[in-house]
Regions:
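Flexible hinge/switch segments at interdomain interfaces of large molecular machines
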Residues: 120-123
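Extracytoplasmic/periplasmic ligand-capture domains
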Residues: 1-111, 117, 127-175
Length: 175
């Protein structure tokens, strides 16, 4: 390393899995830095004179990946709970309907308390590889129902979603 002298003589990395414990350690002065601040605590931390918040856009995205390749997916059932004879997720209209049924604005405002941006692809604006052609799907439950009916599912179907829990901020709530 041939750059300027670092500002620290040593750094100790202390993994603290529990979000409340991380926050308590910061407020008690036991640690100097934490990441993954719970959204419910951001407003409070903004009023803490000894705390400086830093926010930025990241490439952390929670997305829905559906089982569109198997003929008989294990976690997809008919509207009345029977095994499917044809995978509805293979139909692009069904996948588009699922996307249209997600209220991204509500997720940002209610679940993430305003500290997120709606995602329409894996990379946010400003990241290499992002496509300006892919737009965030508008929330349109009526349009989603229409597409499901066109695809042959006027009564819908059942799908079990699996997702992380306590790996990312509010991940289980988002799912």
């Amino acid at each position: 390393y041939h750059g300027p002298k670092p500002h620290w003589a040593k750094i100790i990395i202390k993994p603290i899995k529990s979000a409340p414990s991380r926050l308590a350690a910061l407020l008690a002065g036991d640690v100097d830095f934490i990441d993954q601040v719970p959204t419910v605590d951001i407003a409070r931390l903004k009023n803490e004179p000894k705390v400086q918040l830093s926010q930025g856009v990241s490439n952390r995205v929670i997305y829905l990946h559906v089982d569109q390749f198997r003929d008989n997916p294990q976690y997809v059932k008919t509207h009345d709970g029977k095994p499917v004879t044809k995978n509805p997720l293979k139909d692009v209209r069904v996948r588009k309907a699922l996307s249209m049924a997600i209220n991204r604005k509500a997720i940002v405002e209610r679940v993430m308390e305003g500290v997120a941006i709606p995602a329409g692809q894996l990379l946010p604006e400003g990241f290499f590889g992002r496509s300006d052609k892919l737009k965030v799907e508008k929330y349109d439950p009526d349009g989603a129902k229409k597409l499901l009916a066109e695809a042959g599912y006027p009564n819908g179907f059942q799908v079990t979603l699996h997702g992380p829990n306590n790996r990312y901020i509010n991940d289980a709530k988002i799912v």
